[in-house]
């Protein structure tokens, strides 16, 4: 019965998003908040598996959208934007939480990492809905968001992870896998093109599943790996538009809604208390405005218009994937307590909802 309620919530809020004009991904997160508090979603292990496929599929498709020539052309802009949008909020949050909440260096660093991220998984469908993926701004934003995830991943690894020879060995195998997978794909797609068994689609789904395995072994975000793999496959799939359309249909209709539902289910009202609410009330405006200003100012200096600069400042406040991953890591490792974890998740979800409402309200002013 729980499975039926999950699907019903996802479909209902999908229709609601079309009626009120909010992003489908955001409404699916809201569905997850409701479902996570009314249903025992943790007892449905299939949701975790499908949600993993959702983030992998989204990021793979996002990587496919990047144009290599545009990426090279605007690489410096993306790097500058990403560095400002990550390191400025990181420093502000880190320096503020140390004295105010009496956290130690590692605790403050983890909070700062979790709240300095930008979710490419949320940015991609929103840019897609607004038709920005084929424009220069779309390439700059997506590349910058990917770099922010990489900065977050590197920060978490340097500060907390213990890298050994096994990790290094798996990383070497991962590099070989990512190098040869597109070459194998080119041969398979040519040999088994448009067959009834859908071998090309099965191959892509297998590749995504393999990335999940490697992500766990080398402590790298699966979102980053899937995005990079999609970028490497972009030339291979140029002549296979039908295959890409099939993958988009599966991801956007089935896998990604479950991913966003699962993300919303992390926000538990039952474990909220006065401490977590106070911490969240302090961190939400601090993280939102530090991210907004650091993104807006830099993008405007890169010759972006006022409305576009505001838009970038707002959408870079979409935190989700790596923010939740960092918070879960800190909770399981005993670095942060449940109150701090709840506050982080609350800020991540709230900032995404606020950003979505703002972009919806000013949608007519974004693109001139």
Predicted regions and their residues:
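Small-residue-rich segments of transmembrane alpha-helices in multi-pass membrane proteins
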Residues: 28-38, 81-94, 140-156, 197-213, ...
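Transmembrane helix boundary and interhelical junction motifs in multipass membrane proteins
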Residues: 23-27, 119, 221-225, 319-324
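Structural signature of hydrophobic alpha-helical transmembrane segments
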Residues: 1-5, 44-60, 104-118, 166-177, ...
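Transmembrane alpha-helical segments of multi-pass membrane transport proteins and ion-pumping complexes
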Residues: 10-15, 29, 33, 37, ...
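Transmembrane alpha-helices that form the ion-translocation and gating core
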Residues: 77-130, 263-366
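Membrane-interface junctions of multi-pass transporters
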Residues: 17-24, 33-77, 190-200, 204-282, ...
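Membrane-interface alpha-helices at helix entry/exit sites of multi-pass transporters
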Residues: 73, 133-149, 154, 241-245, ...
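Membrane-interface helix-loop-helix junctions at boundaries between adjacent transmembrane segments
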Residues: 98-112, 123-167
């Amino acid at each position: 019965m729980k499975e039926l309620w999950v699907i019903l919530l996802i479909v209902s809020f999908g229709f609601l998003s079309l009626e009120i004009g909010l992003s489908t991904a955001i409404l699916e997160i809201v569905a997850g908040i409701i479902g996570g508090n009314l249903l025992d979603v943790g007892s449905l292990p299939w949701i975790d598996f499908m949600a993993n496929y959702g983030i992998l599929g989204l990021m793979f498709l996002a990587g496919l959208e990047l144009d290599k020539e545009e990426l090279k052309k605007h690489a410096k802009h993306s790097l500058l934007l990403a560095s400002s949008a990550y390191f400025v909020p990181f420093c502000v949050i880190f320096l503020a939480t140390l004295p105010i909440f009496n956290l130690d260096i590692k605790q403050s660093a983890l909070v700062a990492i979790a709240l300095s991220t930008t979710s490419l998984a949320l940015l991609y469908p929103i840019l897609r809905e607004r038709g920005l993926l084929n424009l220069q701004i779309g390439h700059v934003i997506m590349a910058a968001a990917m770099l922010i995830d990489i900065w977050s991943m590197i920060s978490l690894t340097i500060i907390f992870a213990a890298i050994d020879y096994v990790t290094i060995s798996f990383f070497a195998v991962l590099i070989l896998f990512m190098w040869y997978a597109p070459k194998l794909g080119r041969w398979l797609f040519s040999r088994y093109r448009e067959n009834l068994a859908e071998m090309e689609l099965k191959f892509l789904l297998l590749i995504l599943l393999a990335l999940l395995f490697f992500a766990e072994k080398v402590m790298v975000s699966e979102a980053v790996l899937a995005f990079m793999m999609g970028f490497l496959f972009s030339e291979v799939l140029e002549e296979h538009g039908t295959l890409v359309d099939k993958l988009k249909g599966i991801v956007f209709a089935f896998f990604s809604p479950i991913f966003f539902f699962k993300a919303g289910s992390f926000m538990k009202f039952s474990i909220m208390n006065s401490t977590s609410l106070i911490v969240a009330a302090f961190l939400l405006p601090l993280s939102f405005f530090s991210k907004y200003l650091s993104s807006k100012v830099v993008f405007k200096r890169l010759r972006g218009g006022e409305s576009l600069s505001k838009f970038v400042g707002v959408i870079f406040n979409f935190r989700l994937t790596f923010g939740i991953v960092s918070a879960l890591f800190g909770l399981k490792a005993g670095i942060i307590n449940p109150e701090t974890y709840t506050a982080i998740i609350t800020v991540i979800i709230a900032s995404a909802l606020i950003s979505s409402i703002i972009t919806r309200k000013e949608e007519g002013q974004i693109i001139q």
